[in-house]
Amino acid sequence: MTLLSSNELRKLIQATPHLLENAVDIETQIQPNGLELTLKEIKTIEGVGAVDFDNSERKVPDAKPLEFEDDDWIHLPKGIYKVIFNEIVNIPMNLAAIAKPRSSLIRCGATLETAVWDAGYRGRSESMLVVYNSAGFRLKKNARIMQLLFYTLNSEVEEGYSGVYQNENTK
């Protein structure tokens, strides 16, 4: 497993399908070892969720969109939120990705909770934003909040991601 550099990421962004679509400013979002994703939407999580072994009883709680102010800022009190990214990611069958919050979030008392991004996944993903700071946290629409680190797999997978979140938020 090898972490991809910005040079390799640039090639994949230009390939078909593009590794990343709908970037706000791709030159700013390409970092030495990853791609930054930007904030499209924020929602509150409403209700109870449930996870079981075979997903037959899985329930993702409803979410209520929050509105940005006229200046595109939003103040978030301490708590948890769902964030949706602007970018659509297309992960090739020989790559996987791990997402990390930008260090600026952590320095402000907030972080992101994410999962592994599997080979073959395509979509505009969601993550959980946790605001720990008792004074809250301000975010601007299109802020760069997460960095995706892409790793080459030892061999291409035979079958890529095919779960319920495939192509999420792309319609």
Swiss-Prot record:
InterPro entries: dCTP_deaminase, dUTPase-like_sf, dUTPase_archaeal, dUTPase_trimeric
Pathway(s) annotated for this protein in UniProt: Pyrimidine metabolism; dUMP biosynthesis; dUMP from dCTP (dUTP route): step 2/2
GO terms for biological process, alphabetical: dUMP biosynthetic process; dUTP biosynthetic process
Gene Ontology molecular function: dCTP deaminase activity; dUTP diphosphatase activity
Annotated keywords: Hydrolase, Nucleotide metabolism
Role noted for this protein: This enzyme is involved in nucleotide metabolism: it produces dUMP, the immediate precursor of thymidine nucleotides and it decreases the intracellular concentration of dUTP so that uracil cannot be incorporated into DNA.
NCBIfam families listed in its UniProt record: PRK02253.1
Family membership: Belongs to the dCTP deaminase family. Archaeal dUTPase subfamily.
Name used for this protein in its record: Probable deoxyuridine 5'-triphosphate nucleotidohydrolase
Native species: Methanosarcina acetivorans (strain ATCC 35395 / DSM 2834 / JCM 12185 / C2A)
Taxonomic lineage: Archaea, Methanobacteriati, Methanobacteriota, Stenosarchaea group, Methanomicrobia
Gene assigned in the entry: dut
